[in-house]
Amino acid sequence: SNFKGYYGYPATVCTSVNEEIVHGIPGQRVLQDGDLLSCDCGAYVEADGVQWHGDAAFTAVVGNYASETDKYLDRTTERALWAAIAALAEAGASGWKDARINLIGDAVESVVFDAAQETGHELGIVEEYVGHGIGTKMHMAPDVLNYSVSSKGVKLQPGMVLAIEPMITAGRASNETLDDEWTVVTRDGSRAAHWEHTVALTPKGVWVLTARDGGVSGLEPFGFTPTPLSA
């Protein structure tokens, strides 16, 4: 794991339950049927004295019961992640011409906005915690925002590797950190979901390094096919 000891983090994974958004510390808590659990984990391999890092997260409902709100929150967050990856795939298919990093935030925000409009329920995009570049270190430039901004950000190009990780709440996105100095929770007690993949930009598209199929199944609904690193 590349998590344990990172800035003093005490565990090998982050486990965030219900109103916990991110950086939850595993402990003795007994999970209950219907809990919403987000797991964020990372690993690295070392070659020739150089570390190469990966980072991923997913959300799942514990047990056999899930409220419709929780299921919709989870699906929306995962779809926002894949919509962002699809936006990268589209840019890559066009040779990355004039492609800028904030197309990711545009894609995430569009999915969340449409979902909120469809259901009439409030959904929040957490802005304080964002994705990042990744490679020889777990966190590298550039920041990868999950929301739209006026600036378009850095130019995208083949060879970049990005950790994309939308964190969405079923209420307001306002949050605070608990006394353990790690666990981030929603202020209004609303539940949160967190999905993440590490994505390599190839000359003609993307390859999802943390998906077993490279992103085939996730991109298929958007009409794109990932391109291997050698393509």
Identify the role of each PLM range.
Residues 1-231:
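Active-site neighborhoods and metal-handling regions in enzymes and metal-associated proteins
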